[in-house]
């Protein structure tokens, strides 16, 4: 097949153009550590294969109960919940904890690494006692989540990705947490705090500093995710069994 000189020159130009972009992309990825903490492990004094970790006797019993939920010979299916158990015990997941999970479940360590590096809910770096996760995806952003993030940073004196010197708070941004109807919202450890204002999040932080756990849920007075102006349907308790059924049936 023959191409004109102009077409060949155009193709060569496009190849060079995209080649530069690919090279720049690869260079950027390498500079950032191929995804930073997500994909790369480098031994540190606090995170290496010799970092002490073992499950407590109570958690070994929990692991036995978890494994029983899966068919015999399929312990590998329990990797996610057992990793979560390790994180709850230790606060985060050093590589030694991943190795222990692999040992307990009798799977290759790589199978555990694959899971721990894929899901961002696993913390592969130490985090504070209270892990503040601010949703900044579109619905929350449209409901002024930026003001929530700014208020937290100002209140704690830290930036996104940082931990307070007293190790009490870690602040990160996250993608959608599935509570768009209650935007803006944040997740702190396992709890959702919704319908927030800057004042609300400051009060929540004050309570946490005082050692109290604020009541989760909407801060606007809503019970759940009903319309802000009040219920428009389902305004009374549901009828009992048999309601509306033809007599005699």
Swiss-Prot record:
A Pfam family recorded for this sequence: 2Fe-2S_thioredx
Residues engaged in binding [2Fe-2S] cluster: 135, 140, 176, 180
Keyword Magnesium appears in the UniProt entry: no
Keyword annotations from UniProtKB, A to Z: 2Fe-2S, Acetylation, Electron transport, Iron, Iron-sulfur, Membrane, Metal-binding, Mitochondrion, Mitochondrion inner membrane, NAD, Oxidoreductase, Phosphoprotein, Primary mitochondrial disease, Respiratory chain, Transit peptide, Translocase, Transport, Ubiquinone
EC number: 7.1.1.2
Manner of cofactor binding, per the entry note: Binds 1 [2Fe-2S] cluster.
Keyword Iron in record: yes
Broadest EC class assigned to this enzyme: translocase
Subcellular location: Mitochondrion inner membrane
Main localization, broad class: mitochondrion
Range of the transit peptide: 1-32
Membrane topology, from the record: Peripheral membrane protein
InterPro entries with a match to the protein in the record: NuoE-like, NuoE_dom, NuoE_N, Thioredoxin-like_sf
Catalytic activity: a ubiquinone + NADH + 5 H(+)(in) = a ubiquinol + NAD(+) + 4 H(+)(out)
Subunit structure: Core subunit of respiratory chain NADH dehydrogenase (Complex I) which is composed of 45 different subunits. This is a component of the flavoprotein-sulfur (FP) fragment of the enzyme.
Protein family according to the UniProt entry: Belongs to the complex I 24 kDa subunit family.
Protein name as it appears in the record: NADH dehydrogenase [ubiquinone] flavoprotein 2, mitochondrial
Protein's gene: NDUFV2
């Amino acid at each position: 097949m023959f191409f004109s000189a102009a077409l060949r020159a155009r193709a060569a130009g496009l190849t060079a153009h995209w080649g530069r972009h690919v090279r720049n992309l690869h260079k950027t990825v390498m500079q950032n550590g191929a995804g930073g903490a997500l994909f790369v492990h480098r031994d540190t004094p606090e995170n290496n294969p010799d970092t002490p970790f073992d499950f407590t006797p109570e958690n070994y019993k929990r692991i036995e109960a978890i494994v029983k939920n899966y068919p015999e010979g399929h312990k590998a299916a329990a990797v996610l919940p057992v990793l979560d158990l390790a994180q709850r015990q230790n606060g985060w997941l050093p590589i030694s904890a991943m190795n222990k999970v692999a040992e307990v479940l009798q799977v290759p360590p790589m199978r555990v690494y694959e899971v721990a590096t894929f899901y961002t809910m696993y913390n592969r770096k130490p985090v504070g006692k209270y892990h503040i996760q601010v949703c900044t995806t579109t619905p929350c952003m449209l409901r002024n989540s930026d003001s929530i993030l700014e208020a937290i940073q100002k209140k704690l004196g830290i930036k996104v990705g940082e931990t307070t010197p007293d190790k009490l708070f870690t602040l990160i941004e996250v993608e959608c947490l599935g509570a768009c109807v209650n935007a803006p919202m944040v997740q702190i450890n396992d709890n959702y705090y919704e319908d927030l204002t800057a004042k609300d999040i400051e009060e929540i932080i004050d309570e946490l500093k005082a050692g109290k756990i604020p009541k989760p849920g909407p801060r606007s007075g809503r019970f759940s995710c009903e319309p802000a102006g009040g219920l428009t349907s389902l305004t009374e308790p549901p009828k009992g069994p048999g309601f509306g059924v033809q007599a005699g049936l």
